[in-house]
Amino acid sequence: MSANEPVSVHLLDREYTVGVAPDERSSLMAAAKLLDSRMREVRGSNRMAAVDRVAVLAALNLAHELQQLRDEQQARNR
């Protein structure tokens, strides 16, 4: 089992360092890129929007999409 390594990700021009297993690094980077994109969509042209509010709304949108995909998958498996 390999130890987590620190990786820097950028969300709305802020840097965050997180620990990740080496074999999951590319997946984490893709997730960070997706989240950054969604946060920018939520923020839109309102550069004064609070980062925490933007993050929560982006996370809620992504969670909603995930739930819809799970519901669709369950419906197909019935």
Regions found by a protein language model. Give the residues of each.
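Long, hydrophobic or amphipathic alpha-helical segments
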Residues: 55, 59-77
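N-terminal intrinsically disordered, cationic/polar leader segments
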Residues: 1-2
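Amphipathic, hydrophobic secondary-structure cores in small proteins
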Residues: 9-61
